[in-house]
């Protein structure tokens, strides 16, 4: 199959049910949604807001049409009752029945069109925003393994170090595949494997069940997860399989979320969430990427990532987000990487996220901080589109779960951080963090 950046879909086969939105609640929260749209600086903000402002009117029109349809049905049943009593009247009432049928079809068509527009509006909306989300600049929540100063050092650039140590081959990868692909070799490959093993072991010890998900999913699942990454030039960021409805996943979050699609999950009274950890290859087109970050491991088209995914009861999702964040902090602490935890601003949040934390590591060879993990609470944004529910213990009713995701280990960027922070120019050696040594046969240096 040919891989393209635009979906060309034939013979669609949908497995997801039509999303069910609480339209009345959305209408009540129009100011909050409008603020979310504006603060996220969405490319189509004006169009989405115009559609949102028509939502109340369209919803009221449907209620009025429903009354008209109900009245038509009453008239039809009355005539049919009279015909049932006296079948000789069928000719007398045939014109009236025909007129009522035409009125019914006309009103039903209007109602269907309005419902379609309402559904399109609801699907286009981003999540609302947690009140603690900053407006346009990240807030530093915490420092991890803090340094007194952050000095740039070209001698610690990961590309030069890894090429010299035969850990990385970019030229051959460029010939074989293209720019921003790479080979990890020898200790480079072993370092990736150690990071994966460490992250999986730590996640399992923290109650996450293991999963190896597919790296290709249906486009409808990608859309339902709200994952439509693009740069500010609106260039597409998803790889698709030509003439199919399939795409390569940009994160294991997508297939892990799909594991709960069209299901009622068992969340017992003493269980606030179900937790998964999955490892997969991830694919990013990175259209529009520029600069030196495209020449190393920081911004690549394909990479390995260990992902955390949780389904939570609504009342506990804020707590679960904090637990994911603390897990990520402990990983970075044990690796010894200097970093900062950020409460990310609204203009950095994807449509599904209600709140998001990032962890950025100091990378002296790059001369700046770089994101190595993120954690998001998506509340019911994804579950409504994926039809993932649980049964409320108190009411017995089916309710939508909240979904959360977080990076356990984004391999290439963590390798960048490790190499650039732990390379000693005086000895020419890279120190291996103690937590990884058991997965590298006790190796202390590269």
UniProtKB/Swiss-Prot annotation:
EC no. given is: 6.1.1.11
One GO CC annotation:
cytoplasm
For this protein, the record's Gene3D superfamilies field holds: Bira Bifunctional Protein, Domain 2 (3.30.930.10)
Positions that bind ATP: 284-286, 300, 371-374
Detail the disulphide connectivity of this chain as listed in its UniProt entry: none
Task: Tell me what reaction this enzyme catalyses.
Answer: tRNA(Ser) + L-serine + ATP = L-seryl-tRNA(Ser) + AMP + diphosphate + H(+)
Any keyword Protein biosynthesis? yes
Q: What is known of its domains?
A: Consists of two distinct domains, a catalytic core and a N-terminal extension that is involved in tRNA binding.
Assembly information from the UniProt record: Homodimer. The tRNA molecule binds across the dimer.
Q: What does this protein do?
A: Catalyzes the attachment of serine to tRNA(Ser).
Q: What else is known?
A: Present with 405 molecules/cell in log phase SD medium.
**What family does the database annotate?**
Belongs to the class-II aminoacyl-tRNA synthetase family. Type-1 seryl-tRNA synthetase subfamily.
Q: What is this protein called?
A: Serine--tRNA ligase, mitochondrial
Source species taxonomy: Eukaryota, Fungi, Dikarya, Ascomycota, Saccharomycotina
Q: Which gene underlies this protein?
A: DIA4
């Amino acid at each position: 199959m040919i891989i393209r950046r635009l979906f060309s879909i034939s013979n669609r086969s949908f497995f997801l049910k039509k999303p069910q939105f609480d339209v009345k609640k959305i209408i009540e929260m129009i100011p909050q949604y409008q603020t979310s749209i504006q603060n996220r600086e969405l490319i189509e903000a004006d169009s989405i807001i115009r559609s949102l402002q028509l939502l109340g009117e369209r919803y009221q029109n449907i209620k009025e049409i429903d009354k008209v349809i109900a009245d038509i049905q009453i008239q039809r049943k009355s005539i049919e009752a009279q015909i049932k009593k006296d079948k000789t009247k069928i000719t007398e009432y045939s014109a009236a029945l025909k007129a009522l049928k035409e009125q019914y079809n006309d009103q039903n068509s209007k109602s269907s069109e309005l419902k379609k527009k309402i559904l399109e509006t609801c699907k286009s909306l981003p999540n609302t925003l947690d009140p603690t989300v900053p407006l346009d600049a990240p807030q530093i929540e915490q420092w991890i393994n803090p340094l007194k100063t952050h000095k740039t050092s070209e001698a610690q650039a990961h590309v030069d170090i890894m090429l010299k140590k035969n850990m990385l081959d970019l030229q051959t990868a460029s010939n074989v595949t293209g720019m921003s692909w790479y080979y990890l070799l020898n200790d480079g490959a072993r370092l990736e494997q150690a990071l994966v093993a460490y992250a999986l072991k730590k996640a399992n010890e923290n109650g996450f069940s293991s999963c190896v998900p597919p790296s290709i999913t249906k486009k409808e699942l990608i859309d339902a997860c709200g994952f439509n990454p693009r740069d500010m030039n609106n260039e597409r960021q998803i790889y698709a399989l030509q003439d199919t409805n399939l795409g390569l996943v940009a994160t294991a979050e997508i297939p892990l979320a799909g594991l709960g699609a069209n299901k009622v999950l068992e969340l017992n009274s003493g269980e606030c969430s179900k937790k998964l950890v999955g490892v997969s290859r991830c694919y990013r087109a990175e259209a529009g990427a520029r600069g030196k970050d495209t020449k190393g491991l920081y911004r690549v088209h394909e990479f390995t990532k260990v992902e955390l995914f949780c389904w939570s009861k609504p009342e506990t999702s804020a707590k679960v987000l904090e637990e994911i964040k603390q897990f990520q902090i402990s990983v970075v602490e044990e690796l010894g990487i200097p970093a900062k935890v950020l409460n990310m601003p609204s203009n950095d949040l994807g449509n599904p996220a209600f709140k998001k934390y990032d962890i950025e590591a100091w990378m002296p060879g790059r001369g700046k901080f770089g994101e190595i993990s993120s954690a998001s609470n998506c509340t019911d944004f994804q579950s409504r589109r994926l039809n993932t529910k649980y049964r409320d213990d108190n009411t017995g009713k089916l309710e939508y779960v909240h979904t959360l995701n977080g990076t356990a280990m984004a391999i290439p960027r963590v390798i960048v951080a490790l190499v650039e922070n732990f390379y000693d120019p005086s000895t020419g050696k890279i120190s291996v963090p103690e937590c990884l040594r058991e997965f590298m046969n006790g190796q202390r240096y590269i």
